A protein has these predicted regions:
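Extreme N-terminal starter segment of soluble prokaryotic enzymes
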Residues: 1-3
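Acetyl-CoA-dependent GNAT
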Residues: 5-83, 89-94, 98, 102, ...
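C-terminal "cap" of GNAT-fold acetyltransferases
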Residues: 38-41, 48-50, 105-147
């Protein structure tokens, strides 16, 4: 397993992995999840996107934003064929490590309240709920993990 910075040439792979990973949630939410509709080219240019490769094949990705007092995970996506192998946890650990290297105290993320499988993963990893965003169409949880 290798986690590397995404390049402009990886854009189609990032879109494909994101669409595949979030596909089960489109029907549940009644619309594509926000990461599916994102334009990743600017994020790649800013160095926010990392690809996880398994045996040279793209298996997952994480999008991590650096803020003055925390890091924000915009998206964690693992391709369906690679789920259940610990790659999501590996990406969360990478985010923790990067947060420590930047000298920031915590990692934050938003997740849709209907994404129960993701919420269970985040809680098992040590995130805890800090609030909820009121949105009649996309209610969500705010969670964080202290480094």
């Amino acid at each position: 397993m290798k986690i590397r910075r995404a390049l402009a040439a990886d854009l189609a792979t990032i879109v494909r992995l994101t669409e595949a990973a979030y596909a089960p949630y489109t029907a549940l939410l009644g619309a594509p999840p926000i990461p599916v509709t994102e334009d990743y080219a600017p994020r790649i240019g800013r160095g926010e996107v990392r690809l996880l490769e398994s045996s040279g094949e793209p298996a997952g990705l994480i999008v991590l934003e650096r803020h003055p007092n925390h890091t924000m995970i915009f998206s964690v996506a693992v391709g369906p064929a690679f789920q259940g192998n610990g790659f999501g946890i590996a990406l969360l650990k990478w985010a923790d490590e990067r947060t420590r290297r930047w000298g920031l105290p915590e990692v934050r993320l938003y997740t849709n309240a209907k994404m129960e499988r993701n919420i269970a993963l985040y809680k098992a990893y040590g995130f805890h709920e800090t609030g909820r965003r009121p949105n009649p169409y996309r209610s969500g949880w705010t969670v964080r993990r202290h480094g």
